[in-house]
Amino acid sequence: MKIVGDSEHFKQPYDSDEEYVSKTEDKRDCEAAQKVGMELVSLSKTQLDKIELDEHLYDSIQQAHKIKPKTEAYRRHMQYIGKLMRHVDVEPIKAALAVVLNKNSNETAKLQIFEKMRERLLSQGDSEIQTLVEHYPQLDRQKLRTLVRQATKELAKGPESKSSKELFKYLRSEIQD
């Protein structure tokens, strides 16, 4: 008769399995995949086209755009997208999503810089034109003066100014960092 030690007696079949994933960890992974799916649904079609996705997943995301949010059908569809995301490698999608979202924030930051330049030009006039032309020699001083003068006149009449928009477009097209 062989005596079995306590450790052998209470040993479970999964104790030696190195690839064992607990239910809690599996649920966390599923929820993370569903959150990535929700982020994908929030993207526009052009942004979504920049991310390489499985055809079935892409079609499901497009269908989610057609369903009204805050409905039971939308919630079920989001769970379905989460289910599809579990069968796809999520890491490359997360990386592509970060690139798309970061590119948008970089574009917004650039536009804000041009907006501030325009505001300084309109408030300070010739001194700011001189500073900008020294900093960016590709700018045409005469064109800047004309646009600033017209925009200042139009802003005195009303808040929306065609020349102010032209000044913004000119700065954006000429200054490319």
From Swiss-Prot:
MF term (GO), any: rRNA binding
Location(s) in or outside the cell: Cytoplasm
Main localisation: cytoplasm
Keywords tagged on the record: Cytoplasm, Ribosome biogenesis, RNA-binding, rRNA-binding
One Gene Ontology CC term in the entry: cytosol
Pfam families xrefs: DarP (PF04751)
Record region (Disordered): 1-26
One BP term from GO: assembly of large subunit precursor of preribosome
Stored PANTHER family: UPF0307 PROTEIN YJGA
NCBIfam families for the chain: PRK05255.1-1 (NF003593)
Family: Belongs to the DarP family.
Reported function: Member of a network of 50S ribosomal subunit biogenesis factors which assembles along the 30S-50S interface, preventing incorrect 23S rRNA structures from forming. Promotes peptidyl transferase center (PTC) maturation.
Name listed for the protein in its UniProt record: Dual-action ribosomal maturation protein DarP
Species this chain originates from: Shewanella sp. (strain MR-4)
